Amino acid sequence: MGLKHFLEKIEPHFLPGGKHEKWYALYEAAATIFYTSGAVTRKAAHVRDALDSKRMMILVWLALFPAMFYGMYNVGAQAFGALTPDLLQQSIANDWHYALANALGINMSSEAGVLGKMLFGAIYFLPIYATVFIVGGFWEVLFATVRKHEINEGFFVTSILFALIVPPTLPLWQAALGISFGVVVAKEVFGGTGKNFMNPALAGRAFLFFAYPANLSGDAVWTAVDGYSGATALAQWAAHGADGLKNAITGQTITWMDAFIGKLPGSIGEVSTLALLIGGAFIVFARIASWRIIAGVMIGMIAMSSLFNFIGSDTNAMFAMPWYWHLVVGGFAIGMLFMATDPVSASFTNVGKWWYGALIGVMCVLIRVVNPAYPEGMMLAILFANLFAPIFDYFVAQANIKRRKARSNG
């Protein structure tokens, strides 16, 4: 008996009137992973496309794999470079991540190979991702069951994005709390996928940032070594300017290429602009992400950073950061490619996408440069622009209506 035949045989038990009717959402989610849904459009508009929403979300999920794999490697590389023999023994005794790595025979030294560093990073990343997926999935299933509709595919992307934009040292209970806020408050309360006006992954991270700032910011959360402090490149530039960009382990200057590749501490999936561009190019080529939004973000960022460069400041080193550094440090790349382009919370109209993207680029640089307390600005910039996306679309639509009326009257 083939899998498709088996699924078709048990389907009646999950349909209305069947003995497992209340579990239809779970059946539908499992069945459509392997086969395209047989549902058809019953009213306008009718769209023919080989790529349904589930496949689209899975492609975005896969596009994040380069950043995910490099992020796991970098977690290990940063930790092993900072470890001393005393710190290693202390960590094995007090941290279950290190105890597990030791039990698996992983060489936890700067001489470790790529695979060893990646496996160590996986010990930090995978529990966070599993926690986020299970807890967030629970809320998705609960709301789908209560509302009697299918489980939405967007959670594939929300879960991995959330896990990639947090520090590797984030406690698992906070990961569960953050994704709960993102899924329930930022999405399901407003009706679920397609009706949320904010990016759920970013909303969950913002909640954790304001509720538990010690675990989402500062110098002690980016390197997976207990008691070790290592500032991000943004924090170093904000404190000492370009001359302050130093590798905390080797003392060598961090070059632009180092930052582009991702040889620096940060959230798991945001460090490598190169890996993010590979995945971003894929979703743009597949026409999943809007190139207009990405271009708008870049234009806004370049314009605002150039303005600050022109103005200059004797007291604020961030005024001097050029646009090409803004691109490769912090969460700019992952935000621009994978969060600003969220089709639900972004603008729908083509003109609106340009304005929406430009607002994100401007606000990101503005927050990074002017905000004295926190050097990163991409998260807040995207959430701020999410609020304005409907306004941009409204004015674009009104302008089109006026233009058509003028044309018909002329």
From Swiss-Prot:
It catalyses: a ubiquinone + n Na(+)(in) + NADH + H(+) = a ubiquinol + n Na(+)(out) + NAD(+). Keywords: Cell inner membrane, Cell membrane, Flavoprotein, FMN, Ion transport, Membrane, NAD, Phosphoprotein, Sodium, Sodium transport, Translocase, Transmembrane, Transmembrane helix, Transport, Ubiquinone. One of its GO terms (cellular component) is plasma membrane. One of its GO terms (molecular function) is oxidoreductase activity, acting on NAD(P)H, quinone or similar compound as acceptor. GO terms for biological process: respiratory electron transport chain; sodium ion transport; transmembrane transport. The modification FMN phosphoryl threonine is found at residue 232. Its EC number is 7.2.1.1. Its cofactor is FMN. It is a multi-pass membrane protein. InterPro entries: NqrB (IPR010966), NqrB/RnfD (IPR004338). The chain crosses the membrane at residues 56-76, 119-139, 159-179, 266-286, 293-313, 318-338, 347-367, 377-397. The keyword tRNA processing does not apply. It is found in: Cell inner membrane. The keyword Transport applies. Belongs to the NqrB/RnfD family. NQR complex catalyzes the reduction of ubiquinone-1 to ubiquinol by two successive reactions, coupled with the transport of Na(+) ions from the cytoplasm to the periplasm. NqrA to NqrE are probably involved in the second step, the conversion of ubisemiquinone to ubiquinol. HAMAP family: NqrB (MF_00426). Composed of six subunits; NqrA, NqrB, NqrC, NqrD, NqrE and NqrF. NCBIfam families: nqrB (TIGR01937), PRK05349.1 (NF003756). PANTHER family: ELECTRON TRANSPORT COMPLEX PROTEIN RNFD, NA(+)-TRANSLOCATING NADH-QUINONE REDUCTASE SUBUNIT B. This is Na(+)-translocating NADH-quinone reductase subunit B. It comes from Neisseria meningitidis serogroup A / serotype 4A (strain DSM 15465 / Z2491). The lineage of its organism: Bacteria, Pseudomonadati, Pseudomonadota, Betaproteobacteria, Neisseriales. The gene is nqrB.
